[in-house]
Amino acid sequence: MSSDKKTAQVVDEVEVALIGAGIMSATLGAMLRELEPSWTQMVFERLDGPALESSSPWNNAGTGHSALCELNYTPEKNGRIDISKALNINEKFQVSRQFWSHQLNNGILTDPKAFINPVPHVSFAQGSIQVDYLKRRFDALKDNHMFPNMQFSDDDATFQEKLPLMSQGRDFNSQKVAISWTDAGTDVNFGALAKQFFTAAKAAGTEIRYGHEVVDIKREGSKWRVVAKNLHTGDYQAVHAKFVFVGAGGYALDLLRKAGVREVSGFAGFPVSGLWLRSKNPELVKQHHAKVYGKAAVGAPPMSVPHLDTRVIDGEEGLLFGPYGGWSPKFLKKGSYLDLFKSIRPDNITSYLGVAAQEFGLTKYLVTEVLKDFDKRVETLKEYVPSADPADWETVIAGQRVQVIKPAGAPQFGSLEFGTTLINNPEGNIAGLLGASPGASITPAIMIELLERCFGENMIQWGDKIQEMIPSYGTKLSKDKKLYNEMWEYTQKTLQLESK
């Protein structure tokens, strides 16, 4: 033991060190354990349990992101609906379904109902311009096999039948509304999923050190020296690892910098907090069973897309509305108010300044959102639930998101990215994940990409096993309707998503 991180003794040697006990590390750990059972793994988590930050079910919307209802994945370009991003995200979510199904068949995952449940996905349009867009979006997707049984209606009676809670008190004569929907959607509890993975990992011999914060990563010969602080005793310990994965959410960028990963030079992070309104009133819950996504206001960022969601957590249904944007300098929900200021360095200050100059719309959105009180938030809720009673709803703080700011040439100098960015060094012995949505939903696809980048020499040897995990590996399901249908039926059954 040592009270100084610089003199911390190396007390263990492992093949793989996983930093952060969220869904990212859980997934990569499960993959590597199956591919190389003899490789030792160790997990470090600064909190006292798994999946307590972004993976926690009330810290995210739990949407199984497959672009069935999220309108920002089907932008309009030159008068046409571009579905390429929707197809890409849908394809990756099918990889998730296959991987989870395989883990259930292997007994690694044990209870699908604890982490995934069928919930219809609905797109909601208000006003003639949005309704026209939604109809054209529906026309662009309806015949694609990746979007099964999608339907559209601008009929008031159908709206009332499908969305009774959203119909109460609504004046259908004052504004045109329309919906498109599919019963192929899901609600996912990524916290429960991560916990099942880590339970299996611990049983297989993986050491999980909760209450340990990794404070330094340095190269020592052919290995990485990973130094962790025991947050309960204040002592420091070090381990040697051949491969390091940094799945530390908003703290990933700083750790990759400490490791000397040149690929993050110039990168910065923009923290965005959020709030939800939550209701557990059974009278409301029984009147709404869907994830309903609307369209962001003109000029507003993608993160501002409002949605009214059914959540299934620990077997209990609840309703979540939001997110309402907020701002905090923290890079984790349980982080420090100094996080943002500590992240500013000579190599990324121009990236920060460039984004500050460009993103007026984002700044205006965040300022407006921060100034909203509870009553103002309920007013926004009433666009979806006109009869909303403030007494039925409570405020819940969402997980902290850190959007990636990539360096760019003049005159921008910095580019704000909405999505997930995988980083690795040229040697492929350290990797990390930056960014936010739709990360959790497509984690298996991200980790397959990581394996290809960092363990390329092993991929031929691992090929058959990866094909077992993900039967469609190497094939684009968007180009193979027969295989898509086979995989859909297989995962529907294994994940217990079939209607009864």
UniProtKB/Swiss-Prot annotation:
Keywords: FAD, Flavoprotein, Oxidoreductase, Tricarboxylic acid cycle. The keyword Aminoacyl-tRNA synthetase does not apply. SUPFAM superfamilies: FAD/NAD(P)-binding domain. It catalyses: (S)-malate + a quinone = a quinol + oxaloacetate. Its EC number is 1.1.5.4. Signal peptide: none annotated. The keyword Flavoprotein applies. Pathway: Carbohydrate metabolism; tricarboxylic acid cycle; oxaloacetate from (S)-malate (quinone route): step 1/1. It comes from the Bacteria. Pfam families: Mqo (PF06039). HAMAP family: MQO (MF_00212). Belongs to the MQO family. PANTHER family: L-2-HYDROXYGLUTARATE DEHYDROGENASE, MITOCHONDRIAL. This is Probable malate:quinone oxidoreductase. It comes from Corynebacterium aurimucosum (strain ATCC 700975 / DSM 44827 / CIP 107346 / CN-1) (Corynebacterium nigricans). The gene is mqo.
